UniProtKB/Swiss-Prot annotation:
CDD domains: GAT_Hse1 (cd21386), VHS_HSE1 (cd16978). Residues 136-210, 374-498 are annotated as: Disordered. PANTHER family: JAK PATHWAY SIGNAL TRANSDUCTION ADAPTOR MOLECULE. Pfam families: GAT, SH3_1, UIM, VHS. It is found in: Endosome membrane. Belongs to the STAM family. Residues 212-272 form the SH3 domain. This is Class E vacuolar protein-sorting machinery protein HSE1. GO terms for cellular component: endosome membrane; ESCRT-0 complex; vacuolar membrane. The keyword Nucleotide-binding does not apply. SMART domains: SH3 (SM00326), UIM (SM00726), VHS (SM00288). Residues 441-483 have a biased composition (Polar residues). Residues 153-163, 181-192 have a biased composition (Basic and acidic residues).
């Protein structure tokens, strides 16, 4: 690959979103340095670029063609004004149905510019012939009116605009209330003798088109935008209106699911069909499905018959003439339901994604709540630590806790002993008892009765206890060996077993 190929590839790179004039001038300088050898090579490369399927490459190549035609001398003009180059690279591209309309407008613009530059030289007559042929075969691409208008500026809605709309709304509501009050009050009897005034026809003001009154619009022109927030569409596309973003820009979505903003001068509102039009359309579709379908099936059956001598040519001609006009109706119905199918697919995808997101959030909420409840239940199951001694069952421990309301015996274990605070009244009468393999029960005189294995202490109720010797301030909260307050004193009435 020569240096010229590298320069042309850089100037026509498909990743370029606009013309890079530094690369274009580099190509012009390279051709001007050696026009004898580089001119024909450049036109050959450009011919390949102009027939590319990439619209971006074609647009960049057209800009490069204009630049070298105006800056690289007469030799380049002679190579451009050849019938093979003009027909294959420019004129024939206007008939390509797969080529975007924006590229066709650009080709016609280049042809016009080259024609104006070459028309003074009789030796460049093929350029004039190519221009006249393209203009006669494709006149719509030479008219600038068919191109979309310039996009309006994105002006933010000021606070004054919002206040003005609010004032107009309040004024309309006030007038509506006044008319309602006038109709509600008694009407005056009309004067019969008074002549009636002539009715003056009021000019009908066109309805104001707002987001509230317009739900769908149809594109009048093609719009190709490279801005990330703008919506690109083709002529005839139906856009669903979402909201008003700027003064002359709305946000909408295509049936394919693309969302973006678009200028209002590129679209026109779609008028909702009346009930009569909808009923007529349904009637035509039902007729196509019932009556016309049988005719189509009859014609197909006749044409697929193997017995050619039995075919009635008059019947075939009659059926064919009746079916041919139905192509437009069938095409419209196919387009209508095809667009509706695309809309439903997009809605289904959006709904599935929202349902998936909702289920994920719901699962996270349930799992976090379950963890929280499990932690709370574990905390409630063990409010204070208990220890089971060898040879002693758990019910005996519960009985021991039940029959020791004043203070629990000090428990020895491998861990550090817990400190306890004993009231002064207990220091003289209450002694620390050694821990055996049996539990103890205190009586009213603080005497210990041993409870051995198999002995049921529930058969003997505890005696009554007098609390007069303990001050109330010290009975409200006493620390036990387990480290928890024995607030059972507050709930037990004096003289009652607890």
């Amino acid at each position: 690959m020569t240096s010229l190929d590298v320069l042309i590839n850089k100037a026509t790179d498909p990743t370029l979103t606009s013309d890079n004039w530094q690369y274009i001038l580099d190509v012009c300088d390279r051709i001007s340095a050696d026009p004898e050898t580089e001119t024909k090579r450049t036109i050959t490369i450009l011919k390949t670029k102009l027939t590319s399927k990439d619209a971006n490459v074609v647009l960049r190549s057209l800009s490069l063609l204009i630049s070298i035609a105006e800056n690289c001398g007469s030799r380049v003009k002679q190579e451009i004004a050849t019938k093979s180059f003009l027909q294959d690279a420019l004129v024939k591209r206007l008939s390509d149905k797969k080529l975007h309309a924006t590229v066709k407008y650009k080709i016609c613009e280049v042809l016009t510019q080259l024609y104006n530059a070459f028309k003074g030289d009789p030796s460049l007559k093929p350029m004039t012939d190519a221009y006249n042929k393209a203009r006669s075969e494709h006149p719509r691409y030479f008219s600038k009116q068919t191109q979309g208008p310039s996009k309006p500026a994105k002006k933010e809605r000021t606070q004054q605009d919002k206040d003005r709309e609010e004032d107009e709304l309040q004024r309309a509501l006030k007038l509506s209330l006044q008319e309602f009050e006038q109709q509600k009050t008694g009407k005056k009897e009309p004067d019969v003798n008074k002549p009636l005034p002539e009715i003056q026809p009021e000019p009908e003001s066109p309805p104001v088109e707002t987001v509230a009154t317009v739900s769908k619009v149809r594109a009048l022109y093609d719009l190709v935008s490279y801005e990330p927030d703008e919506l690109s569409f083709r002529k005839g596309d139906v856009i669903t209106v979402i909201e008003s973003v700027y003064r002359d820009w709305w946000r909408g979505s295509l049936p394919s699911g693309k969302i973006g903003i678009f200028p209002l001068n590129y679209v026109t509102p779609i008028v909702n069909k009346s009930p009569q039009d909808i009923a007529k359309e349904i009637e035509i579709e039902n007729k196509l499905i019932t009556e016309e379908q049988r005719k189509i099936e009859r014609l197909l059956a006749i044409l697929s018959s193997q017995q050619i001598e039995t075919i009635n040519e008059d019947e075939v001609t009659h059926l064919y003439n009746e079916i041919i006009p139905l192509r437009i109706q069938l095409g419209n119905s196919i387009d209508k339901y095809g667009a509706r199918q695309e809309e439903l697919k997009v809605l289904n995808q959006s709904l599935n994604s929202e349902i998936k997101l909702y289920n994920e959030l719901l699962d996270k909420s349930i799992s976090s709540r379950a963890k929280h409840n499990t932690g709370g239940a574990m905390y409630q199951m063990s409010p204070y630590p208990t220890e089971q001694f060898p040879g002693q069952s758990q019910p005996q421990l519960s009985q021991q806790q039940q029959h020791q309301p004043y203070a629990q015996p000090q428990q020895t274990s491998n861990y550090a002993q817990q400190s306890q605070t004993v009231p002064p009244q207990f220091t003289q009468s209450q002694q620390t008892q050694p821990q055996y393999h049996q539990s103890h029960t205190r009586t009213g005189s603080h005497q210990e009765v041993p409870q051995y294995s198999g002995y049921n202490s529930n058969n003997i109720p505890p005696p009554a206890t007098t609390f007069n010797q303990y001050p109330p301030s010290q009975l409200q909260q006493q620390d036990t060996s387990a480290g928890f307050g024995n607030d059972v004193y507050n709930r037990a009435a004096p003289g009652q077993p607890y």
